[in-house]
Swiss-Prot record:
GO cellular component, one term: plasma membrane
Functional summary from the UniProt entry: Required to facilitate the formation of correct disulfide bonds in some periplasmic proteins and for the assembly of the periplasmic c-type cytochromes. Acts by transferring electrons from cytoplasmic thioredoxin to the periplasm. This transfer involves a cascade of disulfide bond formation and reduction steps.
Family note: Belongs to the thioredoxin family. DsbD subfamily.
Keywords: Cell inner membrane, Cell membrane, Cytochrome c-type biogenesis, Disulfide bond, Electron transport, Membrane, NAD, Oxidoreductase, Redox-active center, Signal, Transmembrane, Transmembrane helix, Transport
PANTHER family: THIOL:DISULFIDE INTERCHANGE PROTEIN DSBD
Gene: dsbD
Name of this protein: Thiol:disulfide interchange protein DsbD
Signal peptide: 1-19
Amino acid sequence: MAQRIFTLILLLCSTSAFAGLFDAPGRSQFVPADRAFVFDFQQNQHDLTLSWQVKEGYYLYRKQISITPTKADIAAVQLPTGVWHEDEFYGKSEIYRKRLNVPVTVNQAAAGATLTVTYQGCADAGFCYPPETKTVPLSEVAAAIDATPTPAVTQTSETSKPAAQLPFSALWALLIGIGIAFTPCVLPMYPLISGIVLGGRQRLSTGRALLLAFIYVQGMALTYTALGLVVAAAGLQFQAALQHPYVLIGLAIVFTLLALSMFGLFTLQLPSSLQTRLTLMSNRQQGGSPGGVFVMGAIAGLICSPCTTAPLSAILLYIAQSGNMWLGGGTLYLYALGMGLPLMLVTVFGNRLLPKSGPWMAHVKTAFGFVILALPVFLLERIIGEAWGLRLWSLLGVAFFGWAFITSLQARRAWMRIVQIILLAAALISVRPLQDWAFGSPSAQAPAHLNFTAISTVDELNQALAQAKGKPVMLDFYADWCVACKEFEKYTFSDPRVQQALGDTVLLQANVTANNAQDVALLKHLQVLGLPTILFFNTQGQEQPQSRVTGFMDAATFSAHLHDRQP
């Protein structure tokens, strides 16, 4: 008897241990969205907390989270900072892993009030889920006396344009500041400023001279840092509006005008009366003393010359776009430090370190005009799309390298011939996208992609299966938000081996980007958890579950899968 019981226990254990060996090959390795992103909420009067428990190997997109109240008023939602994730098609995106808590302040909620929460995530293995929508019932909350009304709809995804996505970082501000120091409006002033800082004294120790110059630069940096903090704080209040297409176009026009001022078409500077007052205030300070030197530096930060106004304005607009106060203050501090480094060198070592003035300083100013022109191209690229953005970058590159090449022709040194060849080659490379646009791209000769027949409902699928006339059918699910779907199109479906293997197969595709009721019904009918998912049907119109594909496959793997699948 005991032997039989022992045998039965072994049988049960072996069945449990090896059950996975007999699972259907087509079974998805991915869990449903509700298990990948476990959503929960908790309300305590005015305080509501939305929480997600994110499964290991999965992540949520920050920009895909939106919160919309109904019969309720909530404060603006501030999503926490995520971690950066980058892919080929969507670039950098902020994501959340492991756990996410979002606090929401409910100013007022009537009877039957709800909160509609939409979110979307993917798996690291290249599998993305359709947008999930949850309805959160709210308890009645009376409006506080000092509650400030907020807009009825809070779209947190609009605020997810982080400063790091802008084309230059705060470190670039240091290099720009150093470059501005060599423009014709700034460089000739350094010997004069150095003399004022030292109070006209020629015999000071090196340490004392360096200290006074450093204090002057810190005074100037304080003014710029405060300006950066103010602009960043203002930009934070209007950050969502700063992402509107009309606002982006307006900013692009402003940046273009700033660049034109660097080209000498017109002059930007403070009114002369205000500059005179600031100069008089600076002259009242005593040179050679730390306090007086610091005040002179702080006032000097307010006096913008024609060469510094445009770059400073561009950096301020960049900071306003970011809405990041730490970045705003730090960027302007580094910019002022970059402008002050040459002054410190002149104060300590004298004028012998300065290069001689000449036409080259005007060329430095013009070069900064091209740098500023890169900003409107970056902003417009969000509106006009990647293709037109590439053409604008191409046009800017041709203009810059062409100008640099023509300018270099004035040089007489032999080694400049090598520089001229490099500049000419860079201009020819930059013109390539414009050439492809005007005369057609050689890539147009690339193998054609698969010719899919679009379906969107269960009835259309059944009709297509009935019309297949004894041929096998492949159904591909596609969405614009699915990165791996785009990889399938670019790398897998364009491969000749794959196209040959699918030569006798009827190709269907369901675009579920909208994730509307029809899309949801089709996904539910076929038990599709997420994308990419590819289904195969035999000649009788029956799905072959063991052949189902979930997740990305390269051309070689997918081609082998096509040959191995059952007819």
